């Protein structure tokens, strides 16, 4: 007996006008997640998802591509205005912001939410090149 083809659940279109973009720029990758005000994910993208591998993931261009992709996906759900929370020390922070504006999003606020230790864990040792 032949198997019945699996039904693929279609992604429903959410009508959300404003959202929050969480840009996590680490030393190795840049991840962009766009959520609604409650924190439910609308769309997300990362430099690795865009096909960059290794050290190319940490470039500003890779962050720009990831932010454009996440912004386009969010625009399909009706997102027009964004609050941006930027986290991390990576090189893709500013380019991700510019890419979100280039997609046509209106950025209302930019917040730096990088966690700063009050002398917590010992940092990794310095690189000797």
Swiss-Prot record:
**What is the superkingdom listed in this entry's lineage?**
Bacteria
Tell me where the transmembrane regions lie: none
One term of GO molecular function: structural constituent of ribosome
Please provide the Gene Ontology terms (biological process) for this protein: translation
Q: Which UniProt keywords apply?
A: Ribonucleoprotein, Ribosomal protein, RNA-binding, rRNA-binding
Q: Does the keyword RNA-binding apply?
A: yes
List the PROSITE patterns hit by this protein, alphabetically: RIBOSOMAL_S11
Q: Name one GO cellular component term.
A: ribonucleoprotein complex
Q: Which Gene3D superfamilies match?
A: Ribosomal protein S11
Q: How does it assemble?
A: Part of the 30S ribosomal subunit. Interacts with proteins S7 and S18. Binds to IF-3.
User: What NCBIfam families does UniProt report for this protein, alphabetically?
Assistant: PRK05309.1, uS11_bact
Biological role:
Located on the platform of the 30S subunit, it bridges several disparate RNA helices of the 16S rRNA. Forms part of the Shine-Dalgarno cleft in the 70S ribosome.
Q: Which family does it belong to?
A: Belongs to the universal ribosomal protein uS11 family.
**Know the name of this protein?**
Small ribosomal subunit protein uS11
Q: Which organism is it from?
A: Phenylobacterium zucineum (strain HLK1)
């Amino acid at each position: 007996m032949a198997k019945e083809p699996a039904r693929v659940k279609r992604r429903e279109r959410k009508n959300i006008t404003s959202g929050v973009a969480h840009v996590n720029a680490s030393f190795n990758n840049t991840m962009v997640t766009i959520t609604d005000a409650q924190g439910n994910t609308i769309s997300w993208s990362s430099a690795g998802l865009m096909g960059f591998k290794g050290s190319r993931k940490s470039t500003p261009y890779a962050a720009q591509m990831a932010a454009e992709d996440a912004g386009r996906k969010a625009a399909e759900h009706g997102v027009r205005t964004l609050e941006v929370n930027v986290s991390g020390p990576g090189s893709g922070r500013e380019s991700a912001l510019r890419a979100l504006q280039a997609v046509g999003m209106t950025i209302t606020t930019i917040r730096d939410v990088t966690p700063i230790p009050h002398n917590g864990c010992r940092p990794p040792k310095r690189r000797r090149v």
